[in-house]
Amino acid sequence: IVSGILLSAGETRGEASVQTTVRTFVDALAEEWRSTRSMPQFIYDNDFGADTPMVSDTTLQQMVFNVLDNARDASPGWVRLAVTRNADALRITVTDAGPGFAPDMLAKLGTPYQSSKNRPGGGLGLYLVLNVARTLGGSVAARNRPEGGAEVTIELPLAAIALPEAKA
């Protein structure tokens, strides 16, 4: 089901879904991002709580990588990834110490080709993140932090990514 939803959200690689747990998925995601990116200070906090079986797909990982990569581009010295549970949802928050979002960028969040990077094809990362999250019944919120920097929060209902219960 998750693969089908992700395929319809724009994932066309057709890679198989993997059965895992939320904690294992986000721990592996954080470790892979850390090991494949040059980042002086990457803070990772996994406060998800009691683990939950889930189905993961490369699109879920790429969705978070897009946000982390944007944060690294804006704040090459410091990025934080925090994972928590909000009632029946997985909440993934990426924080940076960069200049924050321009007001017009926040107003047009989710519109394709909105980017501060001024390069061809830019501005699709957050657009794809929003589409995948919405397809799964989730949400994406972005804001500028009062102390500086930006924060992007992805919230996905656990029901959309949970493993179906085994039938007795």
Please place each PLM-identified region on the residue numbering.
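Conserved DHp (HisKA) dimerization/phosphotransfer helix of two-component histidine kinases, i.e.
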Residues: 1-45
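Short beta-strand/loop element within the Bergerat-fold HATPase_c
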Residues: 78-88
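Acidic ATP/Mg2+-coordinating residue in the GHKL
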Residues: 96
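Short conserved segment of the HATPase_c
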Residues: 101-113, 167
